[in-house]
């Protein structure tokens, strides 16, 4: 029986509607994925009730022996997964993981060098509206006209800026990041190298993207996105001194009690990431993104950097008379969920943008392969070719609903 349905039908009904949306629409936001029912079940476990301030064997509350077991299992699996010595699995999100890194390793006003938001970076990499741009003196590097990072240029900027920390990682960059080169840049200016791999972590652990280890001094990730686990964050390092500073920065620095039920779910997710089938999934994610990009290029659309090495493509509409927002809405009406995104050389506001970001992880989790992605890519192009044709959008929506119903994700909205 559903306790939720009996107790709060309003929320239950919204859960059911969300299940219907996730089932019948094609989820192509690059940062979203479908997690396992076992992960959701762990999040709904009795660990929801437990306070566990501190760390395993060093708690401020009694009754934490099983919470300790959960957290230690998550830590051990994370270290095995990424090939590192230390992991903090307590951050509630990727942004809080990044905040803890800065709190641990920087003082207010220290110089931070990160990727420009409009070039594919993240708010927490020094963007002015973010705490990272307000508490620290932030500087940026970007991509060249070809949409790719120029590591020689980044070195020039680093030499001019002399940052305390260099952030490498992105939220909308379709090419593989060379962490070895970033470490060389950091060493050349005496900076800490901080890799935020939130978007590519699932590919990294499968050997489908260069690993930040052993190059980075400190690494953060989210546990959802390409890892397909619960929503949350994590920090890793091989340096014992940095690990101690990170632990103190998380608790008591910026968080109180950890979410033990979510840490349990993270451990379950890591078990999935450590399985033999995970490699197959990661390979398919990249193959699906590749065919998506190739079809869109054939149909005359511009991709930032011309293609993809990972799980996403970034379309640029700088040479079109419609915006990223227009494309986002039109595709949404056709049953495809994407997000508007700024692009290099952006001329429109961040609320309108000149691009969209499209990812393959969620539909790959549903079992879709190249054949389905080729079909979907052509439908995306059809909609964009005639962006104001609402009848076409309705017709595509029906076709895609039929496709979606062949790839069932969940048979219930709560676990």
From Swiss-Prot:
Disulfide bonds: none annotated. It is found in: Cytoplasm. It is an enzyme of class 2 (transferase). One of its GO terms (cellular component) is cytosol. Keywords: Amino-acid biosynthesis, Cytoplasm, One-carbon metabolism, Pyridoxal phosphate, Transferase. Homodimer. It catalyses: (6R)-5,10-methylene-5,6,7,8-tetrahydrofolate + glycine + H2O = (6S)-5,6,7,8-tetrahydrofolate + L-serine. GO terms for biological process: glycine biosynthetic process from serine; tetrahydrofolate interconversion. Its main location: cytoplasm. Its EC number is 2.1.2.1. The modification N6-(pyridoxal phosphate)lysine is found at residue 225. SUPFAM superfamilies: PLP-dependent transferases. Pathway: One-carbon metabolism; tetrahydrofolate interconversion; Amino-acid biosynthesis; glycine biosynthesis; glycine from L-serine: step 1/1. It comes from Sulfurimonas denitrificans (strain ATCC 33889 / DSM 1251). This is Serine hydroxymethyltransferase 1. One of its GO terms (molecular function) is pyridoxal phosphate binding.
